[in-house]
Amino acid sequence: MFLKTLSFATLASLFSLMFIGGYVSASGVGLTCPKWPLCPAGFVPMNEFIIEYFHRSVAATTALLVLATMAFTLKSKIAPKGMKMASIIASGAAMGQITLGAVVIIERLHAVLVTVHLGLGLVLFAMMLLVVSYSYGLSSNKKREARKSSLQESSTKS
């Protein structure tokens, strides 16, 4: 149950991050914070840096959630191999996204890099969606098994 909640929260955070990233890109504020990882004003940004800084903060939080999801998935005794692989790929993609995000800023929003950043984000989203799908399947399987054992117990009592 915890893995189901964690993976869904991670996917929701990732969706929010992609939404914010789209806004950053479309509104042209991608270089308002031209240094990485901090803005020129230091740890707490001034108003003109707030949108880009917010994107970076949500990215850091989302990356931690992706890594936590992987850790709990790998630790799970009932998670299938496909779920574990998807969580590993998602974690690798998240680390790649952080690195690529820094390179995008350093290279001043080079179009190819921005496009690759979007593409890798879609891979990350797909892998997390797969992890969520698996986690919902796990909870359905548990309910099915509980019903099945309950039915078996009641039939042996008759």
Protein language model annotation of sequence segments:
Residues 1-158:
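Polytopic transmembrane helical bundles with strong interfacial aromatic enrichment
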